[in-house]
Amino acid sequence: MSTDSEIAEQVVSALEDHQRRTVEILEENESDPEAVVKTLVRLHLEWTEEDRDRAILVSRNRNEVAAGPLGEKLAASNREFFSRMKAWIDSQAEAGRIEPVSFNLLHAVVFAPAQEISKLWLAGRLKRPLGSYADPLGEAAWASVCALPARG
């Protein structure tokens, strides 16, 4: 049985892994925001599917970890990650590839549908492999990003 501190360490490590992989996608597709959005959706689904136990651990314990002794470590990691994401949005907007959109809105339309379908899969409510939803959700996420209003 894992202790609370071991669980917290595992959650922080898992989230930092997801963030690291996200930043790699931003860097690998620097001039192609459509590829970034679609690949981020795929990443989330594949990350969930590749280690179901880790995904469940994060889903069940994330808020508790954020409020506990490792909360500041997680918050610092999140600040750095969100800063990188915001810088990417700004660079894409400055290059005319996307509108200068709100980070919160972009994050919601890209990740929320992938997170929701992942929850259904983790609960055993979907029969198909989670990765099979990547293409339609990626297309929907990109269409949603294109429909977002410029922040003002």
Question: What is the role of each PLM region?
Answer:
Residues 60-66:
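Short helix-capping/turn signature of helix-turn-helix
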Residues 1-23, 38, 42, 82:
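An amphipathic alpha-helix adjacent to DNA-recognition modules
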Residues 4, 8, 12, 34-38, ...:
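Short, structured helix-loop boundary elements
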Residues 55-60, 71, 93-140, 148-152:
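Hydrophobic/aromatic-rich alpha-helical bundle segments in the mid-to-C-terminal region
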Residues 47, 88, 144:
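Short alpha-helical functional segments enriched in proximate histidine and acidic residues
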Residues 24-53, 106-110, 150:
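Hydrophobic alpha-helical connector segments
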Residues 13-23, 68-94, 104-108, 116:
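Amphipathic alpha-helical packing segments from all-alpha helical-bundle domains
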